[in-house]
């Protein structure tokens, strides 16, 4: 939902280390955010989304974990390569505006 870097400023992660940080996540383009929101609404309308979760307090790792709590028989097959972030701490703990969408196996949601 945002093309901003995976910043850690203001995050729960930095707070747990006793700091605040100086680089904070932001929505750099309101137009991009609106188009991303519209695309998600289209996927929901097409019945391709089974569940979704916002990335907020705790970052991506927290959103992913919270999505598994409802069913202890479920698992995840994840690839973060398309996100373009090599720093795994930034990737997992940044609280940048984002969504995690759950789809059925084999469903293609984007081109």
Where are these regions (language model features)?
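Glycine-/charge-enriched secondary-structure boundary and capping motifs
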Residues: 22-25, 32-111
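Mobile "lid/hinge" segments at catalytic clefts and subdomain interfaces of large enzymes
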Residues: 1-27, 41, 105
């Amino acid at each position: 939902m945002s093309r901003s870097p995976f910043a850690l400023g203001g995050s729960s992660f930095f707070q747990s280390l006793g700091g605040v940080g100086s680089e904070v996540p932001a929505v750099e383009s309101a137009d991009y955010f609106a188009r991303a929101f519209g695309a998600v609404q289209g996927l929901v309308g097409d019945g391709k989304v089974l569940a979704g979760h916002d990335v907020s307090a705790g970052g991506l790792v927290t959103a992913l974990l919270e999505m598994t709590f409802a069913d202890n028989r479920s698992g995840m097959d994840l690839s973060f390569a398309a996100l373009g972030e090599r720093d795994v701490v930034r990737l997992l703990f940044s609280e940048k505006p984002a969504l995690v969408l759950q789809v059925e196996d084999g469903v293609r949601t984007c081109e």
